[in-house]
Structures are given as structure tokens and as C-alpha cells.
Swiss-Prot record:
PROSITE patterns: HPPK. Pathway: Cofactor biosynthesis; tetrahydrofolate biosynthesis; 2-amino-4-hydroxy-6-hydroxymethyl-7,8-dihydropteridine diphosphate from 7,8-dihydroneopterin triphosphate: step 4/4. Belongs to the HPPK family. Coiled coil: none annotated. It is an enzyme of class 2 (transferase). Its EC number is 2.7.6.3. It holds the Pfam family HPPK. GO terms for molecular function: 2-amino-4-hydroxy-6-hydroxymethyldihydropteridine diphosphokinase activity; ATP binding; kinase activity. It comes from the Bacteria. InterPro entries: Hppk, Hppk_sf. Catalyzes the transfer of pyrophosphate from adenosine triphosphate (ATP) to 6-hydroxymethyl-7,8-dihydropterin, an enzymatic step in folate biosynthesis pathway. This is 2-amino-4-hydroxy-6-hydroxymethyldihydropteridine pyrophosphokinase.
């Protein structure tokens, strides 16, 4: 059985638009997962002063993976594209976050869904 998941993408280092385009391709290659739709790219300010603006997008995925398995796949894509997590809200080559996982509410140490930065 597949469910619909929404993934937020963001980058503010090393050609952000190209990072996101590569991430869309990688998302479509994840096991038991299909990229259904991709938003246009848009720009947002960094949460911390002095950092470059972020290029962002959202992907809709149909996946048969469990939430933590999808998270592991997203982190593998981040790592493949050189993402380094040095500081919270710091600059990122690529940041992939599960925003929604069907209608599930998850509160686990590694994963909180809906994503804690989503607002009604």
C-alpha cells in the first residue's frame, strides 16, 4: 500500500537551484517511492542573519516506505549531495524534511510529523 508524503527541500550553498533539481531526480529513484509532483522553486530568507537566502521547493511522493525508512532515504540523498549538519538552521547544501506523511501524526525522537515548522 502506498501513501502520499510531502517533502520540503531547501538549499543555500553550492548552486541551490541545481541542488534541488538533483534532489528531485534522487527522490524519484528512492525504493518503493515515486515522485508525483514538484513545486516551482522559490526563495526565502535564512532564519539566521548573515546567511544566504534559501532556494526551496516541495515534492509530493507516493511511497510504500515506513516513515523512518523514508527519513533514512532522505538523509542518504542529503549525504550524497554533500550536506553537513554543523549548526541548527545553519547553511545547507541540501536539507530534506518530511512535512506530512499521509494523515499520520508522529512524535518520535528522529521524526516529528507534521513538521514542526508547518503553520495552519
Amino acid at each position: 500500500m502506498t501513501i502520499r508524503a510531502y517533502v520540503g527541500l531547501g538549499s543555500n550553498l553550492d548552486s541551490p537551484a541545481e541542488q534541488l533539481r538533483s534532489a528531485f531526480q534522487a527522490l524519484d529513484q528512492v525504493e518503493a517511492t515515486r515522485l508525483v509532483a514538484a513545486s516551482a522553486l522559490y526563495t526565502s530568507d535564512s532564519l539566521l542573519p548573515g546567511q544566504p537566502x534559501y532556494t526551496n521547493a516541495v515534492a509530493a511522493l507516493d511511497t510504500a516506505l515506513a516513515p523512518l525508512a523514508l527519513l533514512d532515504a532522505l538523509q542518504a540523498i542529503e549525504n550524497d549531495q554533500g550536506x553537513v549538519r554543523k549548526e541548527r538552521w545553519g547553511p545547507r547544501t541540501l536539507d530534506l524534511d518530511i512535512l506530512l506523511f499521509s494523515d499520520q501524526v508522529l512524535d518520535q525522537p528522529r521524526l516529528k510529523v507534521p513538521h514542526y515548522h508547518m503553520h495552519a
